[in-house]
């Protein structure tokens, strides 16, 4: 029997992948359009209350459901904090940022977590969506950052200006320099307020 666990334990049976997320909404059309725009997703099925979308070889990665009686999302309520999507490279993340900005969709919190360079957005229901790239080339390096002094001192990260990041990228500043974690830059004092809403 071959094991499929991340740590090589052949007795543990773990999922092979995260398949999809389903979001309930009372803003069906806005939500479908937003996720189609943000993820450049294709709709594989849609009727008046359900839409199934994908952006890769999976049959669907996200579904939007408008079941009767759904109320607005409670601000600061318990539950899922955000969904995160990883891009192939720095160039794709910057191109996505610029495409979304041109469509009037801007991040509420751009953060360099050290592990990842991330931009958090809010969908029409207020759910957070993180678009990110890894700041390291290997899983071992990423796991190593969890054990670093930088991470233990600040496990959230530091804010950055995405317009300035894009400007520097187009000016030819090396990607490694742009992804570099700079703990001295600090965290936006309003970060937790922005993220908790």
Predicted regions and their residues:
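Vicinal oxygen chelate
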Residues: 2, 16, 23-29, 84-128, ...
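N-terminal "first-domain core" detector
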Residues: 2-56
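Short, low-complexity disordered segments enriched in Ser/Pro/Gly and basic
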Residues: 15, 76-80
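Histidine-centered active-site/metal-ligand motif
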Residues: 20, 59-62, 82, 113
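Charged, low-complexity, helix/coiled-coil-prone segments
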Residues: 32-46, 64-71, 173-181
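Conserved short beta-strand elements that form part of the metal-binding/catalytic scaffold
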Residues: 42-77, 122, 128-136
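Short secondary-structure capping micro-motifs at structural edges
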Residues: 50, 71, 83, 107-108
